[in-house]
Design a protein with these regions (language model features):
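Intrinsically disordered, low-complexity repeat regions of secreted/extracellular protein precursors
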Residues: 87, 98, 102, 109, ...
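Alpha-helical transmembrane segments and their immediate juxtamembrane cytosolic regions
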Residues: 1-81, 88, 97, 132-426
Length: 426
């Protein structure tokens, strides 16, 4: 029998690609002159850069399913089905990965989310060890750590906003209080604000469902609901009286929201459905077969969704690039097919028995770190002399130089982390 797949390097590679896209967009957005931003070339750069956030969110959902499935197996149950007495509540723990995914804002000061991706072992989990009452079921217990992780990511989003204010020169308690509490700056919604609750929600769906089939169906249903409801939510006047801090999570508006639940949270649930499919594979042969279906199915979804954009809108007026369900599913199709492309790319050297260093995988396993350090470097005081001052070709060159520096920081971070782990294990 062929061995069960280990850590899935192709998911790390895909997350690394999201990191590169994120840095690409942030550097160009921050440093390019307004004149060049009005050019057609910059529009295409923005189109490419806009895929960073969906990939991060999508892979965060994949990690939810892989992590929970790994914990459930270690507890002695099969992820494909749960005993009849398995009860509800959520959970989530990074079982095949590390932190949770990344993201990519468009314009404005972004906030990336980011999450590991693939398969690492995770300790077994019983309802008692998860802090749940006995009888709630092993699936609940396996999912619960991921629910908590989603909550921590949301807290991280708030802390990141406060850090941005401190590094921006607003260091007094009075200034921070006025900006973050009175004016509600910490309530601004960015990628991590959406990613955290969406991860928790995807874990709840995973923990409540009793079989892999129901987990897939439930995740797809929720993802579709976010996509199809987006045009109506954007135009629904009944939401106008809501406090800005709440409305900003439902739909974007100037000055407060870069991302919102509709439709962005849907990418996490779409990724969770794909993660369940990957987690069900029992050996590398089965996983290779599944990846083939991802390639064909992703391209088919991509094409059909693009064609549907030419038909009448069934869910009210929509903007293709911002609110149309068809564009949501176009991106999902591209990302599903992208998994197959990353798998094939990662398999090339292994066909020759080699395992060379991969900058993309390195970025993938340190994505949160890269996000955390690069945002202030790109948008903060360090780059103030070149902000909005570079022609597009020079911005592209600056991006390559900056990306090289980020790779060096990533390697340094990994080296230090390994030394710390080695000392602790002595």
């Amino acid at each position: 029998m062929t061995a069960r797949p280990g850590r899935r390097g192709y998911l790390d590679w895909m997350r690394g690609l999201a990191v590169v896209v994120m840095v690409f967009w942030h550097t160009l957005d921050a440093w390019t002159t307004p004149v060049d931003k009005a050019s057609g070339a910059f529009w295409y750069c923005q189109l490419i850069g806009g895929f960073g956030a969906p990939i991060f969110l999508f892979l965060a959902g994949v990690s939810v399913a892989l992590a929970a499935g790994s914990r459930l197996r270690r507890a002695g149950a099969s992820p494909g089905g749960v005993p009849a007495d398995a009860g509800p509540p959520p959970g989530l723990a990074p079982a095949s990965s590390q932190p949770a995914p990344d993201l990519l804002p468009a314009s404005s000061r972004p906030q990336p989310g980011l999450s590991p991706a693939s398969a690492g072992p995770a300790p077994g989990l019983s309802p008692a060890s998860a802090g749940l009452q006995p009888g709630q079921g092993p699936a609940w217990a396996a999912a619960w750590p991921m629910v908590k992780r989603g909550g921590w990511i949301w807290v991280l989003a708030i802390l990141f906003r406060i850090q941005s204010d401190v590094l921006g020169g607003r260091t007094s308690i009075g200034q921070l209080f006025m900006l973050d509490v009175v004016r509600g700056n910490t309530q601004k919604v960015d990628i991590l604000n959406v990613m955290g609750p969406a991860i928790a929600g995807a874990a709840v769906v995973w923990g409540l469902a009793r079989t892999a089939g129901w987990r897939i169906a439930g995740s797809i249903a929720v993802a579709s609901a976010f996509a199809f409801a987006t045009p109506g939510i954007r135009a629904w006047t009944a939401l106008d009286p809501l406090p800005d801090a709440i409305e900003g999570y439902l739909r974007p508006f100037a000055g407060r929201t870069t991302f919102s639940f509709f439709p962005w949270a849907g990418f996490v649930f779409a990724g969770a459905a794909i993660g369940v499919l990957i987690d069900r594979t029992r050996d590398v042969v089965a996983e290779r077969r599944l990846i083939t279906w991802f390639g064909a199915g992703g391209v088919a979804l991509w094409i059909l969704s693009a064609l549907s954009a030419y038909g009448p809108s069934l869910f009210g007026p929509s903007d293709f690039w911002r609110t149309a369900p068809s564009f949501f599913f176009v991106r999902v199709g591209i990302m599903v097919a992208g998994i197959a492309a990353c798998y094939l790319w990662e398999a090339r050297p292994r066909l020759l028995g080699a395992d060379p260093f991969s900058p993309m995988r390195q970025f993938g396993v340190t994505s949160l770190f890269i996000y955390w350090v690069h945002v202030e470097m790109v948008y903060g005081g360090l780059s103030r002399p070149i902000r909005g001052q570079l022609p597009l070709p020079i911005s592209l060159l600056a991006f390559l130089l900056f990306l090289t520096a980020m790779l060096g920081l990533s390697l340094l971070k990994s080296t230090i982390a390994e030394r710390v782990r080695a000392r602790r294990s002595r």
